[in-house]
Amino acid sequence: MALNLQGKQAIVAEVNEAANGALSAVVADSRGVTVGAITALRKEARANGVWMKVVRNTLAKRALEGTQFECLSDSFVGPSLIAFSSEHPGAAARIFSAFAKKNEKFELKTAAFEGNVVDAAMLATLPTYDEAVARLMSAMKEASAGKLCKTIEAVRVQKEEQAA
């Protein structure tokens, strides 16, 4: 589909806006995946606060200039599907990883978090906020009150030593 200049500018602005509000991004190759499967992926992504779009490589590179995801520019080779997570850093990677397990033709290219290229598998295993709080609470429950007090005291002493 041929796009006029205004259409291209609108796509660049849309992708740039999504990138500026995102915590992480994932780029994938969806060649060979059926339209029905991609539609289901889009539906799941929307439900999890993930923005995704198939974008031309040159437009994607231009849209990501000056954002924390500029490091992804080298991954835009061939058909590219880009997704931005705005609610949880691991959401897009988790959704794409699960989808790739079901669809062998779907291939994760790369992921970015806080301006750095990271392994998508690592990003997908990040705990959600609720999981992290649950882990912290269980760790605090397991530790006896004395151990917790000693740990807090040790941290206080260490910070005082660093300040001096």
UniProtKB/Swiss-Prot annotation:
Subunit comment: Part of the ribosomal stalk of the 50S ribosomal subunit. The N-terminus interacts with L11 and the large rRNA to form the base of the stalk. The C-terminus forms an elongated spine to which L12 dimers bind in a sequential fashion forming a multimeric L10(L12)X complex.
HAMAP family: Ribosomal_uL10
Function, as annotated: Forms part of the ribosomal stalk, playing a central role in the interaction of the ribosome with GTP-bound translation factors.
Gene name tied to this protein: rplJ
Highest taxon of the lineage: Bacteria
The entry's keywords: Ribonucleoprotein, Ribosomal protein, RNA-binding, rRNA-binding
Biological process according to GO: translation
Species assigned in the record: Pseudoalteromonas translucida (strain TAC 125)
Family: Belongs to the universal ribosomal protein uL10 family.
GO CC annotations on file: large ribosomal subunit
A Pfam family the protein falls into: Ribosomal_L10
Protein's recorded name: Large ribosomal subunit protein uL10
GO terms for MF: large ribosomal subunit rRNA binding; structural constituent of ribosome
